[in-house]
A protein has these predicted regions:
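Aromatic- and glycine-rich beta-strand/loop motifs that create alpha-glucan
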Residues: 1-24
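Helix-capping/transition residues at the boundaries of transmembrane alpha-helices
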Residues: 13, 78-80, 157
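Residue-level recognition of membrane-helix boundary sites in multi-pass small-molecule transporters
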Residues: 18, 22, 87, 164-165
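Residue-level recognition of transmembrane alpha-helices
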Residues: 24-27, 92-93, 169-170
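Secretory targeting signals
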Residues: 27-65, 94-162
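Terminal transmembrane helical anchor/hairpin motif
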Residues: 38-47, 127, 133, 166-196
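Amphipathic cytosolic juxtamembrane alpha-helices at the membrane-cytosol interface
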Residues: 83-95
Length: 196
């Protein structure tokens, strides 16, 4: 079997799950909240809310749902198949990356469309107005910077279960978001105080 067939099997397995609903629902909720709550900072806040809260949750839920299918049967169905387990894992990771990329693309398109409506139809003046290129670039960079979390969350979900993985993922993400600026601050002064 080729890698394409493994990927098709993974996509077919998740065809009637909650993933496609989440793929549409989470970006729509994020854009709607940003549009209603912060009119003049809409484009910036749409991305900020997405990468600080909604996108990590989306990635964790996608990975938990991907692993949940086999975990229900204790991996007996997939272990009995005459297939390469490495390719099965690669197909899961690739499917998770594709789902996260589709969600990011939908968010970028929604932010662009709603920003156009707010600016040209409702005459809202944005305080910060990112260009089209910078918004597309932000979407690509956000997607690429989150791709490493998909194998990590799949591994945690496989080992610990979906609920524990969600808790560990959110706690680690929030702790790193809080302490990361201070770590750079400490490293900056430590490097500057050394004699030359």
């Amino acid at each position: 079997m080729s890698n394409r067939q493994y990927f098709k099997a993974e996509a077919l397995k998740h065809r009637h799950t909650v993933l496609r609903k989440l793929l549409i629902l989470m970006p729509v909720i994020c854009v709607a909240l940003a549009a209603f709550l912060t009119h003049v900072f809409f484009a910036v806040d749409g991305y900020n809310w997405w990468y600080m809260g909604m996108y990590p949750g989306f990635v964790a839920l996608v990975c938990g749902t991907i692993c949940e299918k086999e975990k229900k049967m204790k991996n007996r169905a997939i272990l009995a198949l005459p297939c390469d387990m490495g390719r099965v894992w690669d197909a899961k990771v690739l499917y998770g990356i594709l789902m996260s990329g589709a969600a990011m693309l939908l968010l970028v398109l929604l932010v662009l469309a709603v920003a156009f409506i707010l600016e040209h139809v409702l005459n809202v003046t944005f305080i910060i107005r990112p260009s089209l290129f910078s918004q597309l670039e932000a979407g690509v960079l956000l997607w690429l910077s989150f791709c490493w979390q998909i194998p990590w969350c799949l591994l945690l979900s496989q080992m610990l279960g979906r609920t524990v993985m969600l808790l560990v993922h959110f706690v680690l993400y929030d702790v790193m978001a809080i302490f990361c600026p201070y770590l750079f601050f400490i490293c900056y002064f430590r490097g500057r105080s050394e004699p030359e």
